[in-house]
Curated annotation (Swiss-Prot):
Name of the protein: Chitinase 10
Family that this chain belongs to: Belongs to the glycosyl hydrolase 19 family. Chitinase class I subfamily.
Species name: Oryza sativa subsp. japonica (Rice)
EC main group: hydrolase
Phylogenetic placement of the source organism: Eukaryota, Viridiplantae, Streptophyta, Embryophyta, Tracheophyta
Example GO BP: cell wall macromolecule catabolic process
Length: 290
């Protein structure tokens, strides 16, 4: 792998136990950009994603995202999600009905894991706590790859994980900003401050092939065509390959990784809710990272 894969380091998943303490204590026993607000009652124009996930369903999938204990409470609105999706017209709109639903389930599962506040015995189960965080907690560094001259780091800026997919590193913030219309190198903080931009960065990552990697979208809708190197690395199409694209350097080619299993747990739940089978190759245990 030429460069690290964008992913949080001190992930919300690893910090869920801390949140569980907070939850128990509280209960007693992220011109063209839209701002982050927007409460209930949003009526989007018909769109591929809104035809699959209604506002009511969205609220039920992310049951605890606005709990007082979640740092991202009030941030990840349905309106922002749908508005962001309109910038990517092929998202949730490619292939048959099952393929479209499966892609949405996979996307929501990946962002749920990246932002989860759940734990094994959490109220309503561990898979009801997606979108609880909008920013990496206690980042270990500024995630600046100084060798990347195309996307040079700006002094004093940190490129740690932010937003639903926890985009990280200067070589991701830079091109994401260029594609979406903001300065990702000088103003990476906007990903944690504007919910529309936060969702757009996640969808940009989802839809965009990078270097030797296919896009997550291509994998989930059947457009991925493995080359000889992919075949040799056992990078077979399925949800597991999406995990490889997102964070394979840390999670793939190893047995029983808890993070991989957590992603699969979210994915199974969302596929069940949407009434679609999960498809093959859910994990990346035997895949070489990109």
């Amino acid at each position: 792998m030429a460069k690290p894969t964008p992913a949080p380091r001190a992930t919300p998943f690893l910090l869920a136990a801390v949140l569980s303490i907070v939850v128990v204590a509280a209960s007693g026993a992220e011109a063209r950009w839209y701002g982050g607000g927007g409460g209930g009652g949003y009526s989007p124009s018909p769109s591929p994603v809104s035809s699959i996930v209604s506002e009511q369903l969205y609220a039920s999938l992310f049951l605890h995202k606005d709990d007082a204990a979640c740092p991202a409470r009030g941030f990840y609105t349905y309106a922002s999600f749908v508005r962001a999706a309109t910038r990517f017209p092929r998202f949730a709109a490619t292939g048959c009905a099952d393929a479209r639903k499966r892609e949405v389930a996979a996307f929501l599962a990946q962002i749920s894991h990246e932002t989860t506040g759940g734990w094994a015995t959490a109220p309503d189960g561990p898979y009801a706590w997606g979108l609880c965080y909008k920013e990496e907690i206690n980042p270990q560094s500024s995630y600046c790859d100084a060798t990347d001259k195309q996307w040079p780091c700006y002094p004093g800026k940190s490129y740690h994980g932010r937003g639903p997919i926890q985009i990280s590193w200067n070589f991701n913030y830079g091109p994401a900003g260029q594609a979406l219309g903001f300065d990702g190198l000088r103003n990476p903080e906007i990903v944690a401050n504007c919910s529309d931009i936060a969702f757009q960065t996640a969808l940009w990552f989802w839809m965009t092939p990078r270097d030797t990697k296919p896009s997550c979208h291509q994998v989930m809708v059947g457009e991925y065509r493995p080359g000889p190197a992919d075949v040799a690395a056992n990078r077979t199409a399925g949800f597991g390959l999406v995990t490889n694209i997102v964070n394979g350097g840390l999670e793939c080619n190893r047995a029983g990784d808890a993070r991989v299993n957590n992603r699969i747990g979210f994915y199974r739940r969302y596929c069940q809710v949407l009434g679609v089978d999960v498809g093959p190759n859910l994990d990346c245990e035997h895949q070489q990272p990109f």
